[in-house]
Amino acid sequence: MTRSPNAARDARRERMLASPRFDGRVFRNTNIAKAGLKPGTVMPTMKEYICGGERRVPGAPIPLQDPRASWKQAPETGLRVTWLGHSTLVFEIDGARILTDPVWTQRASPVPFAGPKRFHAPPVPIASLPDLDAVLISHDHYDHLDRSAIRALRKRSTRCITSLGVGSHLEAWGIDPARITELDWWEATTLEPSGVVITATPSQHFSGRTLLDRNATAWSSFHLQGSKHAVFHGADTGLTPEYTQIRERFGKFDLVLLEIGAYHPAWGDIHLGPEHALDAHAMLGSGTLLPIHWGTFNLAMHAWDEPIETLSSLAPSRGVQLLTPMLGQAVEPARVGALMPWWRTVAAEERASGKSSWVPETSHDETAVSWPVD
């Protein structure tokens, strides 16, 4: 049954006004968090952006795997994940298949000719995705919500589950309001027939797609609970004490996904980076850690592989088991073996070729920004 767009809009507004995080105009974090550059850091940050010599893009092609053959068989353990790049993943958990933050566009940008460009093609065309039980969208930034991807998914009858307010974008792009479920923090919805429960949980971030809609919609992390497995998808966030609340509510996790890339010390409190990702993992209490939000777009000033190298060097001393699949590789966390450092092969090829960067069809400067846009 379709739902009137006007009725959906009115119901959304009513729910937003009832949210303790909405002040009548914008959504706010629970704790004070700065999304922009910290005071006194503008000029040093700009100098670093202009003069820094970091390898901000990979110096050789990133290896990809095609997951379609794997998807034809159910995961033997009941839990499998396929990282398609950045924060786009396919979860297969206890009979449900869920796509997160679908981005297939060439640039994480409002325009097709400028802005952060992909390091690699998506491992699989969006038209070749398998049947999905849900599309899960954390917030409305361009590197997490791609209009062309949503439009490509319109013909499917898949549910779209997202943060409060984000449904307005989906409706504008042709998604039937009846297919959209918007959640405020701690609200949940159940997928049928699997019974997998998805709960929106806190994150410390911000939202907006233009200069005029900053924080007009909400942002979330998510807890996925199946009959046998539990997954935490951190999406975009800074370090927040609310991770302890999440652990207290849900207990142990089989798999934890946390962002490690596109961070900078001057960027306030809205991204983790590798060290804070380990702190967040400790607060969450358990679970194999799959690092996301790196290796696809140049959204910061660090070397493209610095986040994963830092994480992999620190994780053993923190007792954290990492899962680092190749892009497109369908893996079951219960069967994780040794670290799979595929990014070092890229670095070795870069050194062998003598190239400092490999950026097809764009210049170095076109792919980076000196302030947080995601």
Question: Can you say where each PLM-predicted feature lies in the sequence?
Answer:
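Cap/insert and terminal regions of metallo-dependent hydrolase folds
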Residues: 2-30, 118, 125-126, 134, ...
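Active-site-proximal loop/helix segment associated with metal-binding centers of metalloenzymes
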Residues: 48, 52, 104, 200-226, ...
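Short hydrophobic/aromatic-enriched beta-strand-loop microsegments
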Residues: 100-101, 159-161, 177-185, 254-259
